[in-house]
């Protein structure tokens, strides 16, 4: 929650202004693997530009350097794996811009990003160092089958002789509201 650069949110550890730059340190995260599943309301890895001090966050929002810290189990680097910040704030990419660096002294992965004021939702994922494979949440976030996701279903039709598909229907489904008892 980076909507204010005057007041610290519950996820901020510290906030300092150095010269013309606001430095924000997010509270360190640890592995959630093996912990009981807890539903956290989220925005599925997205972000929204918002500011509590202005009317229009696109014009009046400020920027800050934000330090993210992830402590792996035993404070040891994952063998053969890189840890990445994963979400819309890194364009869901597993590249050098999202890769966290392991700090041997602290025993933690760290990454600093220059972000505009807003609300950011993200996860930590691992990717093989050989760059082949898919993001894996199980080492960092745990693997919980009962999580909430949003799906968009698009139905296309291509008439005989046509050169392009036509969108004839769409719907949005949320797995959270499909489960009994919710």
Description of each model-found segment:
Residues 4, 9, 14, 46, ...:
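Generic serine detector
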Residues 24-81, 167-182:
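Basic K/R-rich, polyanion-interacting modules in nucleoproteins and related proteins
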Residues 1-38:
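Long, internal scaffold/assembly segments composed of regular secondary structure
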Residues 67-117, 129-159:
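Aromatic-rich carbohydrate-binding modules that target alpha-glucans
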Residues 52, 60, 140-142, 151-174:
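Compositionally biased Ser/Thr/Gly- and acidic/asparagine-rich
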């Amino acid at each position: 929650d980076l909507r204010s650069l005057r007041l610290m949110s519950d996820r901020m550890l510290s906030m300092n202004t150095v010269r013309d730059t606001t430095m924000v340190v997010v509270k360190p995260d640890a592995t959630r693997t093996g912990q009981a599943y807890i539903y956290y309301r989220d925005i599925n890895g997205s972000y929204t530009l918002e500011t509590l001090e202005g009317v229009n966050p696109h014009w009046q929002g400020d920027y800050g350097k934000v330090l993210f810290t992830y402590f792996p189990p035993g404070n040891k680097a994952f063998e053969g794996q890189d840890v990445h910040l994963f979400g819309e704030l890194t364009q869901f990419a597993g590249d050098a811009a999202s890769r966290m660096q392991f700090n041997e002294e602290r025993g933690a992965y760290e990454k600093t990003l220059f972000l505009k004021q807003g609300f950011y939702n993200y996860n930590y994922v691992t990717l093989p160092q050989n760059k082949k494979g898919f993001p894996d949440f199980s080492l960092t976030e745990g693997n919980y089958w009962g999580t909430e996701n949003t799906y968009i279903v698009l139905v296309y039709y291509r008439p005989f002789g046509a050169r392009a598909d036509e969108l004839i229907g769409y719907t949005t489904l949320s797995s959270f509201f499909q489960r009994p008892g919710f």
